[in-house]
């Protein structure tokens, strides 16, 4: 399910009931980090994960890290500075593990040696969104870092699972 431009509240109120329930992938945070305190953000995230677990009991839930931004974006908006994002991602990982969910650290695939969004993945003026190459790297990371399922074969064109 892709929910670009929708709020987590909108997702919580109905969109999820119409989606496939083989797996659920959650990414919440980039916009919310700007508008909420860290404590409010983590409380909301915890509640959201609890609701998903309750509503979709038995369905694997993959909680994704917040993706890195450019160094320039972190200067413009301190909540999106990559050191801060790493701290929040650590808290998100702890939340996921404490609730028995999977955690995917996309930073491994998207960040450069300094922890910033790789330059060849930057796609827009905002330093947050990626270009098609970046999104492809992200999708590849997800496909290669989730629990194996024959269902995934339709998305894999190379490698040992193709």
Residues of each region from the PLM?
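Conserved SGNH/GDSL esterase-like catalytic core that processes O-acyl groups on lipids
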Residues: 1-47
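Short, flexible, glycine/charge-rich loop motifs used to bind or transfer phosphoryl groups or to couple energy/partner
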Residues: 13-16, 52, 118
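Structural recognition of the beta-strand scaffold that forms the well-ordered cores
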Residues: 23-28, 32, 60-65, 102-105, ...
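Short hydrophobic alpha-helical module
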Residues: 27, 52-55, 83, 95
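Generic structural signal for well-ordered alpha-helices
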Residues: 45-50, 89
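Internal catalytic-core helix/loop-beta-alpha segment
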Residues: 49-58, 62-68
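Catalytic His-Asp segment of secreted/periplasmic serine-dependent ester chemistry enzymes
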Residues: 68-162
